[in-house]
Amino acid sequence: MWLVLAFTSAALLGFYDVFKKQALKGNDVVAVLTLNTFFSSLIFLPLVILSATGALSPDSIFYVPSCGWEVHKYVILKAVIVLASWLCGYFALKQLPLTIVGPINATRPVMVLLGAIFVFGERLNLWQWTGVLCAIVGFYFLSRSGKREGIDFRHNRWIVLAVMASAFGAVSALYDKFLLAPAESGGVGLNRMVVQSYFMFYQFLMMIPVLLIMKWNGNEKDERKDIGVVERKKASFLSHSSLFSSSMFSFRLSIPLVSLFLCAADFVYFYALTLPGALIAVVSMIRRGSVLVSFCIGALAFHEKNLRYKAVDLALVLLSMVFLYLGSR
């Protein structure tokens, strides 16, 4: 059952990536991310209220138990890790082709596996080491494909941010295992709905000061530029400039769709991890299979280039996941 849920989460995550690329295209990154966390919070807010008032039964899969600081401190750290991944990933995805970012994200299971070695003391078998090697080779060939589009993996800051996003995502996956695992297994034993609901709320609260700071920074730049020329026009609340983006903000239907598909994908993901026998490495690997959806739809929707070369690179990354699966059986 958990395997079926993992594949479902992967499909939802693929559409999430496509909508995210559409939402970010020529748009303000910080404003889009702030609204994504806002809409995600709105999705879970009714569940928290219904659970607190007793309208939802504790036996419901949507029930959110009440909890204190001892639980919330773990969720806040989860929110920080995920938000760091999203900030890096959003900036990278706006500037890079989806057919480049997708395969980079697909290497995340390898990072999770390597992290499991150092954090949980796990040992890799021959199949898993073969998978790691395939991922490294695939990443190398992906860098060569990027050069055909003028993207130098060694000196491109957006590539660095994409890799950092994947690294933070791998840390988040390992932290999920720690949070959801029962105490007798060395984990915290948190309820999955508590984690998913409240980390969305905390992310939105964290994004508010980020948005205000970036708005103030952008307005300050506008004032310096316009002194002695013309009076600066009153800026819209969400039309600021930033270090990475000077785009104006425009609301699109794809923005709430990002939140909807993300929440659905994460709900299925967290539920899968709570089922008996669920393996975090395998679930994480299957979720990265979302790259097939985002790669195919992204290639058609955004008319991206060098697809033949990138398809070979992607095949190597997917082959690495097959080896990881064989090694995890």
Question: Predicted regions: what is each one?
Answer:
Residues 2-5, 30-52, 160-164, 168, ...:
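Hydrophobic alpha-helical transmembrane segments of multi-pass integral membrane proteins
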Residues 2-8, 56-88, 105, 157-167, ...:
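Loop-to-transmembrane-helix transition segments
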Residues 14, 45, 79, 83, ...:
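Hydrophobic/small/kink-forming positions within alpha-helical transmembrane segments
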Residues 25-32, 87-104, 184-193, 267-288:
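Structural motif at transmembrane-helix junctions in multi-pass transporters
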Residues 39-43, 104-118, 202-206, 265, ...:
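Alpha-helical transmembrane segments of compact multi-pass small-molecule transporters, enriched
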